[in-house]
Regions:
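Acidic, metal-coordinating helix/loop segments flanking the phosphotransfer/catalytic sites
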Residues: 29-49
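Active-site residues of response regulator receiver
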Residues: 52-53, 83
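Receiver (REC) domain active-site loop signature in two-component systems and cognate sites
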Residues: 56
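A short, hydrophobic beta-strand element within the central beta-sheet of small alpha/beta folds
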Residues: 76-86, 94
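Short, glycine/charged-rich "phosphate-handling" switch motifs in NTP-dependent
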Residues: 100
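C-terminal output helix
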Residues: 107-118, 128-132
Length: 137
């Protein structure tokens, strides 16, 4: 999983919630979209899910989502947008640009655990990501 949010407190909350689920998910973190794209292009193991905040410095979630969903390798990764914005424009734009889910913050901790548990279970069962070794040949 790749967690992209400029707020370190929010990232810690997500990590705590994922830890409470009880499975050993590997979690990579990025503080903005540019860090996320750099990570995705340089990793040997693509995440099964990207959790992406919309409003961040350097490269925001909107730009990052577009870049992910237009990349032939990265586009298969499900992206869950989590934002404090519930504006129809932001929600519609996210889905139009390839987001798989849009959730509005803040969450109650218990709700966050339940949501992440369902998401991770669903995406890990039904998503097959490209084999990077095959793509490089």
């Amino acid at each position: 999983m790749l967690l992209v949010d400029d707020d370190s407190t929010d990232r810690e909350l997500f990590i705590d919630a994922i830890t409470m689920i009880g499975k050993n998910y590997e979690i990579a973190e990025a503080g903005n979209g540019e860090e996320a794209i750099t990570f995705l292009r340089n990793t040997d193991s693509l995440p099964h899910l990207i959790i992406l905040d919309l409003n961040m410095p350097v490269k925001d979630g909107r730009e990052t989502l577009k870049e992910i969903k237009t990349d032939p390798i990265l586009q298969a990764i499900p992206v869950c947008i989590m934002s404090t914005s519930s504006a129809n424009f932001d929600v519609q734009s996210a889905y139009t640009n390839g987001a798989n889910l849009f959730l509005v913050k803040p969450f109650e901790f218990k709700e966050l655990i339940e949501m992440l548990s369902s998401l991770l279970s669903l995406f890990s069962k039904y998503v097959t990501l490209p084999d990077l070794a095959k793509l490089e040949k």
